[in-house]
UniProtKB/Swiss-Prot annotation:
Recorded catalytic activity of this chain's protein: 5-[(5-phospho-1-deoxy-D-ribulos-1-ylimino)methylamino]-1-(5-phospho-beta-D-ribosyl)imidazole-4-carboxamide + L-glutamine = D-erythro-1-(imidazol-4-yl)glycerol 3-phosphate + 5-amino-1-(5-phospho-beta-D-ribosyl)imidazole-4-carboxamide + L-glutamate + H(+)
InterPro entries: Aldolase_TIM, His_biosynth, HisF, IGPS_HisA/HisF, RibuloseP-bd_barrel
Subcellular localization(s) per the UniProt record: Cytoplasm
Physiological role: IGPS catalyzes the conversion of PRFAR and glutamine to IGP, AICAR and glutamate. The HisF subunit catalyzes the cyclization activity that produces IGP and AICAR from PRFAR using the ammonia provided by the HisH subunit.
Name of the protein: Imidazole glycerol phosphate synthase subunit HisF
Keyword Cytoplasm: yes
UniProt GO MF annotations: imidazoleglycerol-phosphate synthase activity; lyase activity
Recorded name of the encoding gene: hisF
Organism: Escherichia coli O6:H1 (strain CFT073 / ATCC 700928 / UPEC)
GO CC annotation, single: cytoplasm
UniProt KW RNA-binding keyword: no
Active-site residues annotated for this sequence: 11, 130
Gene3D superfamilies: Aldolase class I (3.20.20.70)
Family label: Belongs to the HisA/HisF family.
GO terms (BP aspect): L-histidine biosynthetic process
């Protein structure tokens, strides 16, 4: 059995790490490189960096920090934000990133997933899915351009359909960003995760809602996700990664102990 992964998420805007609630009202958390180093030392299995402004305002991620991160950590990391071409991806991977993640550009041009997978291998192609639960219809819908409140829009894709589509096109991993839960720290959306798990046959990462150690346990035990991504609880030092992993191990979760 593969070990479950604990993955801190660092949202990057203008060279600094920020965090919002339900993708809005972002506050500055700190500088990128020291935070990355701290999380690696605490025992994170992987890091994910999202340039949350890149896709919405047309820029590719400012790459100067990618190589600096690669120099100070020895765990895999993934970079997302405005990657619209093979050239964009090649540059980021050449700076030392292990994976690249695409989200809004994949919705704009789904063939990008296949072209990236063919060029670089499925193992380093992650597709992020920003999913919103519509209480009126009882359905989960994929959102696009969530880095900019004024441009965020609901797409025609229902989440379960898009999950299956990106797998067919070559996604090697899926990060499910559950927008309703983002930053509110009351638990992952287990109902949605279970539905997605049934149709997702590549590694599935839960994102949005972690507030306690028990929330991580529930995601692993009840929804069988491969990794759990979180931001607020790590940034605000509500949960220590080493202590979280020790707790999960006592609960029978297969986890890498540092």
């Amino acid at each position: 059995m593969l070990a479950k992964r604990i993955i801190p998420c660092l949202d990057v805007r203008d060279g600094q790490v920020v965090k919002g609630v339900q993708f809005r009202n972002h506050e500055i958390i700190g500088d990128i490189v020291p935070l990355a180093k701290r999380y690696a030392e605490e025992g994170a299995d992987e890091l994910v960096f999202y340039d949350i402004t890149a896709s919405s305002d047309g820029r590719v991620v400012d790459k100067s920090w990618v190589s600096r991160v690669a120099e100070v950590i020895d765990i895999p990391f993934c970079v997302a934000g405005g990657i619209k071409s093979l050239e964009d991806a090649a540059k980021i991977l050449s700076f030392g990133a292990d994976k690249i993640s695409i989200n809004s550009p994949a919705l704009a041009d789904p063939t990008l997933i296949t072209r990236l997978a063919d060029r670089f291998g499925v193992q380093c192609i992650v597709v992020g899915i920003d999913t919103w639960y519509d209480a009126e219809t009882g359905k989960y819908h994929v959102n696009q351009y969530t880095g900019d409140e004024s441009r965020t829009r609901v797409t025609q894709w229902e989440t379960l359909d898009w999950v299956q589509e990106v797998q067919k096109r070559g996604a090697g991993e899926i990060v499910l960003n559950m927008m309703n839960q983002d930053g509110v720290r009351n638990g992952y959306d287990l109902k949605q995760l279970k539905k997605v798990r049934e149709v997702c046959h590549v590694p599935l990462i839960a994102s949005g809602g972690a507030g306690t150690m028990e929330h991580f346990l529930e995601a692993f035990r009840d929804a069988d996700v491969d990794g759990a991504l979180a931001a607020s609880v790590f940034h605000k030092q509500i949960i220590n990664i080493g202590e979280l992993k020790a707790y999960l191990a006592t609960q029978g979760v297969e986890i890498r102990i540092c």
